[in-house]
């Protein structure tokens, strides 16, 4: 019976489950996923403050892994992408959160290139591995969202002339929770407000998580079992992905000295490469881009006629709103910007009293606002009675809330700084952030690609449900 070839996504998800399970249970065995010519990058900076270089080969990778002091690592996988690449390889991108040695969770991105091991079908090893913590790349910077209360009252005309589009970060996510003893939480995606005022929304296709009963997946292996296998054998379809790891063998992963026949060439594309069509921008965005050009003219006419004719469109003047008694209370107290802090990445279930008690440790809190506009995470503002607590909070960053949530704390910008940012954004126009990725792409790894199976499957290739 000829078994069907597993899809790249199925291969990627099974690899992710095995890799992060071993990272939690036996990090000293992690180097067995790699081969003699594998490359490995795991974030961090060297002694000169520059991004650390890659290391090559099992010995160097093992030394690098041990230097990370992985202890009781818990991983929350938020998303896994996998695509077919050259010579039946699979490229896998993982996004999630990682906690090492019971420290706070940190967002990370990791990319693997899985190459065929060569001697056994559907057996892979890690040829390239790139890992980065997001806070090492982006830092704790976050752009302050537009205030909605005071500036709507005091500057209604400016708000008309500079409409700002709030980007929709509510992408589709699914929890890819690793099936070891890791914590399983159905959390909302940790998204932050984008700094660009006029983003062009793009929608990426998201792979549906479907169980494929007829496709084989890679057999699970464990370091405790030392039984050596000689040839692959089919297993029953009833075998499931959640079987105990200790029932499989890791000996075949390290005992084989493979010939270079399984090397990955740099030419040729396998016939099963998954081509995902990129979504095209909608043509209806064109008339929307013309609206800001027409609004200033209409606003100018409204201002010229304001003395005799009340405006028919747009926000009502402050004079009329004040008569209704819904605006004047907001203007009673005006706190200096130096007494205020912007707080981002707030948990969606946090309440004002809990957050106020937390910041009371730094000084007297006179006012606290939490803005929850339907998008997560929430953000807010804390007002102290003096500027000293503000500087105290800023000097103690990073600020950990509940011991596990890292708050994005920034000093509130002055009005002139906010207006300057808006002018810069309008001059720059729509598009992505300025600049590009730091550094350049590294060339191909040195030498031939003689593999040591890391993502080995042991004795057999078993179909999974």
Curated annotation (Swiss-Prot):
Crosslinked residue numbers (Glycyl lysine isopeptide (Lys-Gly) (interchain with G-Cter in ubiquitin)): 36, 50, 59, 64, 76, 123, 352, 356, 375, 392
Region (Acidic disordered region): 142-224
Protein name stated in the entry: Ras GTPase-activating protein-binding protein 1
Organism annotation: Bos taurus (Bovine)
Residue positions where Phosphothreonine is found in the record: 143
GO cellular component labels: cytoplasmic stress granule; cytosol; nucleus; perikaryon
N6-acetyllysine modified-residue sites: 375
UniProt domain NTF2: residue ranges: 11-133
Activity regulation behaviour: Under physiological conditions, G3BP1 adopts a compact state that is stabilized by intramolecular interactions between the RG-rich and the acidic regions that inhibit phase separation. Upon stress, polysomes disassemble and mRNAs are released in an unfolded protein-free state.
Domain (RRM): residue spans on this chain: 339-414
GO biological process: innate immune response; stress granule assembly
Keyword set, alphabetical order: Acetylation, ATP-binding, Cytoplasm, DNA-binding, Endonuclease, Helicase, Hydrolase, Immunity, Innate immunity, Isopeptide bond, Methylation, Nuclease, Nucleotide-binding, Nucleus, Phosphoprotein, RNA-binding, Transport, Ubl conjugation
Domain notes: Can mediate both protein-protein and protein-RNA interactions via the NTF2 domain and RNA-binding domain RRM; protein-protein and protein-RNA interactions are essential for undergoing liquid-liquid phase separation (LLPS).
Compositionally biased region (Basic and acidic residues): 296-306, 317-326, 412-427
Ranges of Gly residues composition bias in the record: 429-446
Keyword Chloroplast set for record: no
Biased composition (Acidic residues): 145-157, 184-205
Subunit structure as annotated in this protein's UniProt entry: Homodimer and oligomer. Component of a TAU mRNP complex, at least composed of IGF2BP1, ELAVL4 and G3BP1. Binds to the SH3 domain of Ras GTPase-activating protein (RASA1) in proliferating cells. No interaction in quiescent cells. Interacts (via NTF2 domain) with USP10; inhibiting stress granule formation by lowering G3BP1 valence. Interacts (via NTF2 domain) with CAPRIN1; promoting stress granule formation by lowering the saturation-concentration of G3BP1. Interacts (via NTF2 domain) with UBAP2L; promoting stress granule formation. Associates (via RG-rich region) with 40S ribosome subunits.
Cofactor mode of binding and number, as noted: Mg(2+) is required for helicase activity.
Residues carrying Asymmetric dimethylarginine: 428, 434
């Amino acid at each position: 019976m000829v078994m069907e070839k597993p899809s790249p996504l199925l291969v990627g998800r099974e690899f992710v489950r095995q890799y992060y399970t071993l990272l939690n249970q036996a990090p000293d065995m992690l180097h067995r996923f790699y081969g003699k010519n594998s490359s490995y990058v795991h974030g961090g900076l060297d002694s000169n403050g520059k991004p650390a270089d890659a290391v090559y080969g099992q010995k160097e990778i093992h030394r690098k892994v041990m230097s990370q002091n992985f202890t009781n690592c818990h991983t929350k996988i938020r998303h896994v992408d996998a695509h077919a690449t050259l010579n039946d390889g699979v490229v896998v991108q993982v996004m999630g959160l990682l906690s090492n040695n019971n420290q706070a969770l940190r967002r990370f991105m990791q990319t693997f290139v899985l190459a065929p091991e060569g001697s056994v079908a559907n057996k892979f090893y890690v040829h390239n591995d790139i890992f980065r913590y997001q806070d090492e790349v982006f830092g704790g910077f976050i752009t302050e969202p537009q205030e909605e209360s005071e500036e709507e009252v005091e500057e209604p005309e400016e708000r008309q002339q500079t409409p700002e589009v709030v980007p929709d970060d509510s992408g589709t996510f699914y929890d890819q929770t690793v099936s070891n003893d890791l914590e399983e939480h159905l959390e909302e995606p940790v998204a932050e407000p984008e700094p660009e005022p006029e983003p062009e929304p793009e929608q990426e296709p998201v792979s549906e998580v479907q169980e494929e009963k007829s496709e084989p997946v890679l057999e699970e292996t464990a370091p405790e079992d030392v039984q050596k296998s000689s040839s692959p054998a089919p297993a029953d379809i009833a075998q499931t992905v959640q079987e105990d790891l200790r029932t499989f063998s890791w000996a075949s992963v390290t005992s084989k000295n493979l010939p270079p026949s399984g090397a990955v060439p740099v030419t040729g594309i396998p016939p099963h490469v998954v081509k995902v069509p990129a979504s095209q921008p909608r043509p209806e965005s064109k008339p929307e881009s013309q609206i800001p050009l027409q609004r200033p003219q209409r606003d100018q006419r409204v201002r010229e006629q304001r003395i005799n004719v009340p405006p028919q469109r747009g926000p009502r003047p402050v004079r009329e709103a004040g008569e209704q008694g819904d605006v004047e209370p907001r203007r009673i107290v005006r706190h200096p910007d130096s007494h205020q802090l912007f707080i981002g990445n707030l948990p969606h279930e946090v309440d004002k009293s809990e957050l106020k008690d937390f910041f009371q440790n730094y000084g007297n809190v006179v006012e606290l606002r939490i803005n929850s506009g339907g998008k997560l995470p929430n953000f807010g503002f804390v007002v102290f009675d003096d500027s000293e607590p503000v500087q105290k909070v800023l000097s103690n960053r990073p600020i950990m809330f509940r011991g596990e949530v890292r708050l994005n704390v920034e000093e509130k910008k002055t009005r002139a700084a906010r207006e300057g940012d808006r002018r810069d954004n309008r001059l720059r126009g729509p598009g992505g952030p300025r600049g590009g990725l730091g550094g350049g792409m590294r060339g191909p790894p040195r030498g031939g690609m003689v593999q040591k199976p890391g993502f080995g499957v042991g004795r057999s290739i078993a179909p999974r449900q």
